[in-house]
Amino acid sequence: MTRARRRVVAIGLDMLAVPFTEQLMDRGSLPALAGLRETGTRFLLDHGTAQATGLAWEHVATGRSPNHGGRPSAVEFDPATYQVRQLGTDLDPAFERVDRRTVVFDVPYLDLRRADRVAGVVGWGAHDPGVEPAAQPPELLEEFAARVGPYPASPWLYATPWPTASRCEAMADALADALDRRTDAARWLMTERLPDWDLFFAVSGEVHSAIEGLWHGVDADHPLHHHPSACAAGRGLGKVLSALDRFVAVLTDAAKAVGADVVAFSMGGMGPNRSDVPSMVLLPELLHRHAFGQPLLRLPNAWSKRPSSIPDPLRGRGRALAGGSWIPPETRTGRVRAAAVRQIPPGWRRGLRRSAGSEVDHEGPAEMSLRWQPASRYQPTWAQMRAFALPSFYDGRVRINLMHRERRGVVSLGQYEAVLDEIESVVRACRDPRTGEPVVATVDRPGLADPLGLSPSNADMVLTWRGFAAAFDHPDLGLIGPVPFRRTGGHTGRHGVAYVVSSSLQPGDGGVRSSFDVVPTIIDLLGCDPPDDVCGTSLLTP
């Protein structure tokens, strides 16, 4: 049923550490966000186990959960070739199926190539965009580039600046300036270039990047909180949040000018990063040693002699290793191919990557390389192993080399649970040398019900980590690490948040709701019923 037409401004706050952000609101540091909280209805959002997929914006852009047409991970494993790749979305945008005029700006995982009824620009400066840069109408992309220019903080989107205060300051300055550029671009799109909208939906990802790089500056419990860079990191994170507040102020003022409702939200919460080192480095090496009885990871003695330390890559001999020369080397095939590609003019490289299978065609999903992840360097041995660690951005993910599922499987279906038990026992035996505590918090086995039917983007075992391990100490396999931290912030916050300003809701506390309720709420406020394949329930529904 279609109801009266209304206007909505949706603001994606990608991603907030909610308690910390609201403390700044209470101090008066973020007046625009505080105004939304005071005049609107505040809902805490629970993303559940879907938060670990790292695909929050695919859930928003498509309206689908991992259990309803979505996927459990952006990392796709090919059981025929044992290759892995990180894929963007291949799902249609939810708002394409809503009978309202929608304009978007940098909404991640919203593929405008699959949308005829959605206008705007995507892939300009999003954190994990999930799509190729595109615009609708197509000529807008060139016009936008001429007016706004390229995204100015690209080198800092995934930076790890903690070793120096100057890099923390530079990251914060660049992201704050980029957010101000984003604010100007959003204002132009919504009020001048494409003003005839029912839904204007803009997302900022600068705080996401800032928290991942600078979190140690505001978290007193973080192992790097007393590092010389921490003060600069804390100031820098506050600076980026202030820029976000200016972004929110401009969009909410524009919404008020046309009588539009406002939905500002963060699908999940941010906090300390506990996963990069264990998932990307330590777990792959542990399983390699368990399989072959020898290490692949070669660390400097200066690090190994101090197992309870967190190496600083810019101190002592670590300075020579700051580029990651301690990471297991690529295979000869990978090195030769990478060297050959570097000799080709940049404008020709995309065609080569497509022909080689590392990017799909124009109609397929965007594809990003995973060669930078240490876990990928173990790939040549996966077919010989009973269990191996997949590249991961969050939790540890273990794949069993199962017969009749993997092309060169070595584990029979009858051995499946026993091998899982064995791998879990190996990982649970590991301790953090810095604290003496176990490194594992929880273990899940997604494939138990149907091992042969496990999807290529899923794992047979998923591990969440306890504490901040820079090293594993196993009673038989020895010390692995320590290695330097990567991101200091991660996707560990308990809740996201939504601030909804609408006459359809009473201001105040709305309690805890599912993160999947955000998209149905936006559609409901527009005066439409959500399409059947959109998950969740409108926040307007008690």
Where are these regions (language model features)?
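Active-site His/acidic residue clusters
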Residues: 191-239, 277, 394-396, 400-414
